[in-house]
């Protein structure tokens, strides 16, 4: 049935056929995610509501914005993308998130939490001003409903004088279980129909509708039609209680573990997050001032043990990255030593607070930045390739990049007594242990991983930041040594400050910089400027990502395609040394 499905015909389906359609959606989503990886549990829980949306509304004339996008797989399958769904999250394939360039059914690109209500308001005002006739819908989970941007948008609802439908898909989870006072209000309504809480929501200018079982198709069809009818008179909040992982027993029992699922058979590398969790627990055992803050991602960031062992010093503030940054700054002002663990792509949401609250006050906050660099299959909205650039411009902030998981341990030890803002950034997986000098970390001090003994008129040094770039450097070194050529490899573990002693002392005539970051404002440009100001006369060649948003795909392939191409770098090194 799903293979031949057409949105135009769904209104002719019987209830029995619609239930079969729901079953087929779940099977297709499960099979595809097992093969390609992706977000499983959230999508399994949103099947009935999505079928009801297609049955009641008229897409693509009506517009829907999926907040984050973790619930959009059923929508993609019902909007003409079944045949290509097997390419989910692959290079050139179907995106795991809504994408306007992919289909006319996708009204607005998403990937980060809290944007859907604002986006729906904007589309609704465009409709009103152009005199168009269409419904505009924001589909948002209870985890995202904690985000402050949602309440900025709700505060604008009456001012903008427009009509939207907000579907609140309440499964009690973001990645982790949903936390916070706002969720307590939502949960009171779900559990007991608390009238005072309903009035609070309606004070924004919304008519409230509740659905006890959002995975009951009959109930969803009726509620969706009622919401559509009410929408003619003003904005509506349709609150549906669903089960994350619905229809797959293991996922229902383990919603956090099946939130994001790798392809079956994927190699299991040790993750930096595991080392972060172990390291922070060890530090906290010795230092009672150490605290940890997470924005709704404690499991993914390796913090479960810390939250278990030190609950009084562990704080999950929900999807509220700005609040988390100010909380850390003020904890530091009160004499604590806060660590804020967060994905690179989400840290950029708190840019102002990093400047204004943490760094301008020179607070000893440590940012533990996971998924830095190209993240791969989640595409443009999740690549962590900007942090070196936007953090490098901030005074008082030190930026460190460990070469491997063991150096992350050493950097955490260093951070415990560091009295200034510090950012430590690293990718997801740690595959290699490089060895090295095994000395205590010193601010701004780099490390030779290999020092050439060759004497020649031309001497080259590769300055590489982080594990991925050092892997490339060491691979090229091996190939060059097999051809009788040699060069220095430097673990540039501090991006800010640079190792000015190295820059002063090096006898290299050619410098190559490698970074898992965009070129603009990044490590390479800083190195080029430093050598120019030192009047060294070196030729500096930068390898970083060009000025484009990087789509989904494999990490190594994307590195090569967008500016850190191992073959190209090797050819340049050989041309210098030959």
Q: What are these model-derived regions, one by one?
A:
Residues 1-32, 200, 250-264, 575:
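Cofactor-/ligand-binding subdomain signature composed of acidic, glycine-rich
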Residues 21-22, 39-160, 290, 295, ...:
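Cofactor-binding active-site loop characterized by glycine-rich and histidine/acidic residues
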Residues 27-34, 95-109, 132-137, 305-317, ...:
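Glycine/charged-rich beta-loop-alpha catalytic/anionic-binding loops adjacent to active sites
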Residues 37-46, 66-70, 98-117, 140-144, ...:
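Active-site nucleophile and cofactor-binding loops and adjacent substrate-binding regions
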Residues 84-94, 159-171, 359-371:
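A glycine-rich helix N-cap at a beta->alpha junction
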Residues 106-265, 269, 273-274, 278, ...:
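Glycine-rich ThDP/TPP pyrophosphate-binding loop and its adjacent helix/strand module
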Residues 244, 248-347, 353-363, 466:
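Non-catalytic terminal/interface segments that mediate subunit docking, oligomerization
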Residues 268, 376-378, 397-398, 525-578:
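Peripheral docking tails and interdomain loops at the edges
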């Amino acid at each position: 049935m799903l293979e031949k499905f057409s949105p135009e015909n769904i209104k002719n389906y019987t209830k029995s056929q619609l239930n079969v359609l729901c079953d087929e959606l779940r099977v297709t989503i499960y099979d595809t995610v097992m093969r390609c990886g992706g977000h499983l549990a959230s999508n399994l829980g949103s099947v009935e509501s999505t079928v009801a949306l297609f049955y009641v509304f008229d897409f693509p004339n009506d517009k829907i914005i999926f907040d984050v996008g973790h619930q959009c797989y059923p929508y993609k399958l019902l909007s003409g993308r079944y045949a290509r769904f097997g390419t989910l999250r692959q290079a050139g394939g179907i995106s795991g998130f809504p994408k306007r360039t992919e289909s006319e059914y996708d009204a607005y690109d998403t990937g980060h939490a809290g944007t859907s209500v604002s986006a729906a308001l904007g589309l609704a005002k465009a409709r009103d001003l152009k005199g168009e006739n269409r419904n505009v819908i924001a589909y948002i989970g209870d985890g995202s409903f904690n985000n402050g941007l949602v309440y900025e948008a709700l505060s604008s609802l009456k001012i903008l004088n427009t009509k939207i439908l907000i579907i609140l898909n309440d499964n009690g989870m973001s990645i982790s279980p949903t936390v916070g006072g706002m969720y307590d209000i939502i949960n009171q309504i779900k559990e007991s129909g608390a009238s005072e809480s309903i009035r609070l929501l309606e004070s924004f200018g919304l008519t409230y509708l509740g659905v006890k079982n959002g995975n009951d198709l009959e109930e969803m069809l009726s509620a969706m039609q009622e919401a559509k009818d009410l929408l003619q008179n003003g904005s509506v909040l349709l609150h549906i209680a669903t089960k994350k992982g619905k229809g797959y027993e293991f996922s229902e029992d383990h919603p956090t573990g099946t939130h994001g699922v790798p392809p079956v058979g994927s190699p299991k590398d040790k993750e930096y997050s595991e080392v972060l969790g172990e390291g922070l627990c060890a530090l906290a055992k010795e230092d009672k001032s150490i605290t940890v803050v997470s924005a709704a991602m404690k499991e993914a960031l390796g913090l479960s043990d810390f939250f278990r062992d030190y609950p009084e010093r562990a704080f999950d503030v929900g999807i509220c990255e700005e609040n988390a940054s100010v909380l850390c700054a003020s904890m530091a002002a009160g004499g604590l030593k806060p660590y804020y663990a967060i994905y690179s792509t989400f840290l950029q949401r708190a840019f102002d607070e990093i400047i204004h609250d943490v760094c301008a006050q020179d607070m000893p906050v440590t940012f533990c930045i996971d998924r830095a660099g190209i993240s791969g299959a989640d595409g443009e909205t999740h690549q962590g390739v900007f942090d070196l650039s936007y953090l490098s411009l901030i005074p008082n902030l030190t930026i460190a990049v460990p070469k491997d998981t063991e150096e992350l341990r050493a950097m955490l030890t260093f951070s415990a007594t560091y009295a200034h803002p510090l950012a430590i950034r690293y990718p997801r997986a740690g595959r290699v242990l490089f060895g090295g000098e095994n000395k205590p970390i010193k601010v701004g001090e780099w490390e030779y991983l290999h020092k050439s003994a060759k004497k020649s008129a031309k001497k080259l040094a590769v300055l590489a930041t982080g594990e991925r770039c050092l892997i490339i450097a060491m691979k090229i070194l091996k190939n060059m040594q097999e051809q009788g050529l040699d060069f220095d490899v430097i673990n540039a573990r501090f991006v800010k400050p640079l190792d000015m002693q190295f820059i002063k002392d090096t006898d290299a005539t050619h410098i190559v910089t490698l970074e898992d970051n965009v070129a603009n404002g990044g490590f390479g440009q800083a190195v080029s400027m430093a050598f120019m100001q030192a009047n060294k006369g070196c030729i500096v060649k930068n390898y970083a990502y060009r000025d484009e948003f990087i789509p989904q795909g494999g990490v190594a392939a994307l590195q090569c395609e967008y500016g850190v191409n191992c073959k190209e770098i090797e050819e340049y090194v050989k041309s210098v040394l030959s």
